[in-house]
């Protein structure tokens, strides 16, 4: 699927990897709808890139109705949807047994709801809208790209909730691709390593240095633009389906 003139929905598209994806797809001729809750950042991006290229709808992906409304907004503004990229999510660090109490169950549920259930919520409703498309010359109607993490394979100490949520995204990738194959919609997942997002840039050296040491080649943190580049390649490569791709410079997470 070519990028030019395609309509792309990006959750978390106002910051970090999502913002990089927004910028990359707009630069390559796509129209983007940002689904986020960061009004200030999203509106600033729309002003910078042009309201004719990118629009924004405040969306809590953990709830059904806001995502239904967002899909209706996409159809109203652009008429159709070709690509959905799920970047919205967050992390949380806590050991199963802390010094004073066990891991808070509500915190575990929140991470699962946002990172896993939220991803599934957007995927199912985006697929419903994509299914209305006539399809490309090869019959393809849409592409869905979810975001996991290398923590979904080798989570560190204190990452039980985050690892479970991202392993869930990885686990449903092939099944989702098989489910949606009859609708001519592809599903793939990117599992990023450590990227130089604002959150990581603000971390103290004692956090950054061990992570940097684990990178191989290139021996550095990933740049958000590199995530956007891979997302674009997934869209453009019609035979790539049901795969989770690690984007991590051959990094493997250590226990801590």
Task: Please tell me what each predicted stretch does.
Residues 223-247, 252:
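C-terminal substrate-recognition "lid" of short-chain dehydrogenase/reductases
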Residues 3-33:
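Canonical Rossmann dinucleotide-binding motif of NAD(H)/NADP(H)-dependent dehydrogenases/reductases
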Residues 90, 101-121, 145, 169:
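Catalytic Tyr-X3-Lys loop
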Residues 91-109, 128, 132-138, 158-161, ...:
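Conserved mid-core segment of classical short-chain dehydrogenase/reductases
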Residues 128, 177-179:
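Alpha-helical segment proximal to the catalytic Tyr-Lys
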Residues 123, 165, 173:
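Active-site helix of classical SDR
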Residues 149:
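Residue(s) in the substrate-gating loop at a strand-loop-helix junction
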Residues 113, 205-226:
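Catalytic Tyr-x(3-8)-Lys segment
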